[in-house]
Amino acid sequence: MARVILYISNDVYDKVNAIVEQRRQEGARDKDISVSGTASMLLELGLRVYEAQMERKESAFNQTEFNKLLLECVVKTQSSVAKILGIESLSPHVSGNPKFEYANMVEDIREKVSSEMERFFPKNDEE
């Protein structure tokens, strides 16, 4: 085991000492608990926390990139569906059926979307 001489503030020393005293009151024997052992345990714990934080910084979730990618996918989907609806409305199999006229399909979609959005984001009376 490596030996390290370390200078700490009186406040830190008092806190480490308080942990040692608490463990002794909980029944730990003097030979099982010491300031040195407790300080070593706290240093190891702090090192693990530090390493975990560094890993999170390296592989951090980028909300802006996620939002950009999500918006791009939504716009592509919206554009694709609009083209498909336009093509479908010109099909001879549905011609003459008002349910499949482009303007009616768009209005129907808007109503359904508005209804679903209202479920999750109720309109305030103030708006």
Swiss-Prot record:
Recorded family membership: Belongs to the relaxosome TraM family.
Record Pfam families: Tra_M (PF05261)
Subcellular location(s) of the protein: Cytoplasm
GO-annotated cellular components: cytoplasm
UniProt-listed NCBIfam families: PRK13713.1
Function description: Conjugative DNA transfer (CDT) is the unidirectional transfer of ssDNA plasmid from a donor to a recipient cell. It is the central mechanism by which antibiotic resistance and virulence factors are propagated in bacterial populations. Part of the relaxosome, which facilitates a site- and strand-specific cut in the origin of transfer by TraI, at the nic site. Probably autoregulates its own expression. Plasmid specificity is conferred by the TraD-TraM pair.
Lineage, top ranks: Bacteria, Pseudomonadati, Pseudomonadota, Gammaproteobacteria, Enterobacterales
Coiled coil regions, renumbered to chain: none
Keywords attached to this entry: Conjugation, Cytoplasm, DNA-binding, Plasmid, Transcription, Transcription regulation
Superkingdom classification of source: Bacteria
Protein name as catalogued: Relaxosome protein TraM
Subunit-structure text: Homotetramer. 2 homotetramers cooperatively bind to DNA although they do not contact each other; cooperativity is achieved by DNA kinking and unwinding. Part of the relaxosome, a complex composed of plasmid encoded TraI, TraM, TraY and host-encoded IHF which binds to the F plasmid origin of transfer (oriT) in a site- and sequence-specific manner. Interacts with TraD. Also interacts with TraY.
Organism: Escherichia coli
Encoding gene (name): traM
Listed SUPFAM superfamilies: IHF-like DNA-binding proteins (SSF47729), TraM-like (SSF140581)
GO molecular function list: DNA binding
InterPro entries xrefs: IHF-like_DNA-bd_dom_sf, TraM_DNA-bd, TRelaxosome_TraM
